Design a protein with these regions (language model features):
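Alpha-helical interface subdomain recognition
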Residues: 1-112
C-alpha cells in the first residue's frame, strides 16, 4: 500500500493539516501566556482538533481496510477514542457558538 501515490498524497495532506493545527495551538498558548484572552483561538483549535482527529483516524481505518476495524487493532481504538475530543469539554456546536459570538456574528436576542 505504501507505494500507492494516493496514499502518499493523502498522508501529506493530513500532515499539512496537523502542522496547521499545531501552529494554531501554539498561537493560542502564546496568547494565554502573554495574559491575553485566548478563548477564540483555543476554541478554534479544539474544534479543528476534534474534526481533524476524526479525519485522520478515518483515513487510517480506510487504509487498513477490514483489519483496521478489528477490536485488537490500535487504529480501531484510536477511531473510537478520538470521537471524545469533539464531545468532551464542549461539543463542536458549542465551540462554533463561542467563535461566532467572539466574531460578533451571533444573532442577538430580540426583546419585544
Amino acid at each position: 500500500l505504501i507505494d500507492n501515490q494516493y496514499i502518499h498524497f493523502r498522508l501529506a495532506e493530513l500532515q499539512t493539516e496537523v502542522e496547521a493545527l499545531r501552529a494554531l495551538t501554539y498561537q493560542a498558548c502564546e496568547q494565554h501566556i502573554a495574559g491575553q484572552d485566548a478563548t477564540r483561538l483555543a476554541s478554534m483549535a479544539k474544534l479543528k482538533a476534534g474534526r481533524l482527529g476524526r479525519e485522520v483516524t478515518d483515513a487510517c481505518l480506510q487504509f487498513w481496510g477490514g483489519n483496521g476495524y478489528m477490536w485488537d487493532n490500535p487504529v480501531s481504538r484510536a477511531f473510537r477514542d478520538v470521537r471524545l475530543v469533539s464531545i468532551g469539554g464542549g461539543a463542536d456546536e458549542i465551540m462554533l457558538g463561542i467563535i461566532c459570538k467572539l466574531m460578533g456574528i451571533l444573532p442577538s436576542k430580540r426583546r419585544d
